[in-house]
Structures are given as C-alpha cells and as structure tokens.
Amino acid sequence: MKTLQNNFVEAIGNTPLFKLKAASEITGCNIYGKAEYLNPGGSVKDRAALALIRDAEEKKLISKGGTIVEGTAGNTGIGLCLLGNSIGYKTIIVMNDNQTQEKKDLLRNIGADLRLVPPKPYKDENNFVKYAGRLADELKSSNNHGVVWANQFDNTANSKGHYETTGPEIWEQTDGKIDGFVCSSGTGGAIAGVSYTHLTLPTVCRV
C-alpha cells in the first residue's frame, strides 16, 4: 500500500476494511467496517467533496482562484474547505447557527468563510441549502475564476464518486465475496453509489 502521498487529494480513499469481531461472532458472519475516518478530513464526506469539485472542474465551471459555496452541517464542508486549500479555491460554508460551536470553530480554523443563518425548513427560501445556492448565484459575476454551488443533496456527482471509488474498493477488498452492504444515509450519495456499483458486478448483494 502506498503510504506517502503528494497532496491532500491523493490521500482520499483506499481506506481499509477491518473485521468487526463482536458483530461477526454474534451473527456467525464475517462483518467488516470500512475505515472512512482515515480519510484526511476525518470522514467519508471527503470522497463526496472531491467528486463534487472534480465534476465542476470537468465542466469548466471553476478554476484556481474560484469559490466553492455549500450549505452543510459539517463534514462535507470540512472536506470541501481542505480540498479547496490544497487545490486553490476559496470556500464559503453556509450553516445553521444552532450547530455546535466545535463545528463552527473547526471550519473557521481551516479557512472557511462561515456564514451562519437561522434554522429554517427546507421549503423556506432561507433554508441553509437554498441560501447557499442563491449566494453562489449572486457571487458569480464577481469572480472570473468561477463560483460553484456544490449542492451535495441534488448533485449526482456525489453518488458517482462512490460508484467510481467506494464501491469498487469494497469489491476488490472482499475479492467479490460480499453478500450485503449496510450504510447510514444523509444525502444518499454513498448508499446510492455503492449500490449501483454492485448492480453492475456479477454478485448478489443486498443493500
């Protein structure tokens, strides 16, 4: 395994599987956890952040010096900001003002321009996600290098990133011997992407 990486981007992914001993013994199955906390930003959301940025770059929506805007409760914002620092983008994170002080401090400490808004239901135009999209539109005319709204909740690049990385990694690490996949869901990117990977492979994997 390559352990020396040239930059933050290269350190994302290829996380190990480790056997969950107690769960395996109780069920009589081999149950493994994928150590996504070993991504450099500390969570699986680094994968989504990278996929969202690469998608914007491929579509020529942003170049070095540009700005990424996102509404997030934490981990995706951390990934976007750390990647932005590494690649050369400014990051504006829109977050509900009732989030923990630790999250706010962490995002500010890694360089995010943090915009706090009052909590609103999704149908409200000032919901943090919709606020982020509107802010990105407002800023586009002021930056020649591009301003993009990452939009992790609706951007299919999120699930595509997992289809191209997380799913194949699990397949290779288990030599294709996988009967089931369990995943919590926030945006749905990880579970959708990994599920689609296994639909395209010669296996019967319950999700």
What residue ranges belong to the model's regions?
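PLP-dependent amino-acid enzyme catalytic core
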Residues: M1-L199, R206
